[in-house]
């Protein structure tokens, strides 16, 4: 039976100053489909960013038998203030993980697979080799399936980026997350210019790969700052842009400043398309990998 609910773990109650949480942030999920996909992930010892990051779209994606696989474990070496993924000392890299991801993708009959990761600053290559191995395993078991990688900045090491690019995913995603002015407060172990550099390098060295990034609103940014961010990202050659509402995971995370309206998101999309982005997903519940296959289909004819 399908339910409509507000999930306490990912859609926190609005701070008193913001009033009641808007109706457009309510989500729907199918419990049976959610449990089925979750059971498969558990059997194969896999993580999904859907669960670890408490994504509000988890129910819809699970209902459609899709999931974003989070490789390299569920513990991150960074402590970004917006993110619900645990921070600490990660476990050793699981050598069976690439093939297990491929097995799950085959069992779920996925046409488009999204791979993301916990940031692994403890690894010399930032986890690049595990990405490459997973891409190749999926190619082996699921020929014809397209692949999207949502990578960390890998400390800006071009040799690590090359390892991922040489495995030839259809889409290379790296998120800038927020405007330049809020970077230090929101993700202190990252850097705005480094993220732009990752996008630029990937597009320049693999022009046939679609490059993608995304950011959140509701952290205290201004309209002018959003506009400058779009210009900075477009200059890198980025093809695809996602814009979504920041949802404060717990009271310990970065404070929510505002709820952008659906009209705000429509305006952001119109502005980004006018600037020259090839595809823009801009909505309150838009996330990096949400309906990712639609973005790929939209830009597929460009190359």
Predicted features along the sequence, with ranges:
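Auxiliary Fe-S-binding modules of radical SAM enzymes
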Residues: 1-68, 99, 103, 133-144, ...
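Local cysteine-cluster metal-coordination motifs and their immediate loop/turn environment
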Residues: 49-61, 72-87
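Small/polar loops that bind or transfer phosphate-bearing groups
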Residues: 71-72, 149, 282
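Short, glycine/serine-rich, charged loops/turns that create anion-binding
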Residues: 76, 119-122, 154, 220, ...
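Core AdoMet radical
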Residues: 84-101, 107-198, 212, 216, ...
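Glycine/Thr-rich phosphate-binding loops of Rossmann-like dinucleotide-binding domains
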Residues: 79, 123, 182, 251, ...
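Conserved functional loop/turn residues at catalytic and ligand-binding sites
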Residues: 75, 79, 84, 109, ...
């Amino acid at each position: 039976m399908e339910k409509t609910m507000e999930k306490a773990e990912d859609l926190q109650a609005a701070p008193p100053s913001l009033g009641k949480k808007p109706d457009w942030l309510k989500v729907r999920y199918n419990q049976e489909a959610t449990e089925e996909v979750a059971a498969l992930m558990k059997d194969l010892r896999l993580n999904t960013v859907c669960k670890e990051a408490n994504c509000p779209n988890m129910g819809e994606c699970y209902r459609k038998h899709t999931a974003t696989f989070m490789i390299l474990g569920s513990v991150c070496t960074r402590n970004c203030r917006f993110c619900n993924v645990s921070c600490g000392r990660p476990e050793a890299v699981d050598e069976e993980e690439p093939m297990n991801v491929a097995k799950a993708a085959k069992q779920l009959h996925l046409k488009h697979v999204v791979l993301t990761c916990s940031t692994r600053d403890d690894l010399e290559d930032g986890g690049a080799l595990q990405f490459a191995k997973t891409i190749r395993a999926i190619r082996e078991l699921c020929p014809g399936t397209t692949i999207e990688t949502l990578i960390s900045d890998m400390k800006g090491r071009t040799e690590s980026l090359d390892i991922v690019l040489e495995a030839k995913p259809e889409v290379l995603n790296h998120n800038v997350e927020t405007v330049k002015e809020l970077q230090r407060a929101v993700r202190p172990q990252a850097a705005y210019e480094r993220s732009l550099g990752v996008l630029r390098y990937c597009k320049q060295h693999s022009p046939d790969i679609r490059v993608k990034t995304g950011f959140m609103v509701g952290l205290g940014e201004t309209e002018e700052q959003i506009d400058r961010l779009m210009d900075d990202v477009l200059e890198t050659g980025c093809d695809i842009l996602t814009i979504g509402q920041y949802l404060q995971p717990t009271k310990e995370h970065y404070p929510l400043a505002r709820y952008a309206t659906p009209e705000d998101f429509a305006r952001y999309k119109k502005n980004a398309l006018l600037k020259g982005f090839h595809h823009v997903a801009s909505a309150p519940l838009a996330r990096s990998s949400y309906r990712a296959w639609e973005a790929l289909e939209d830009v597929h004819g460009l190359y």
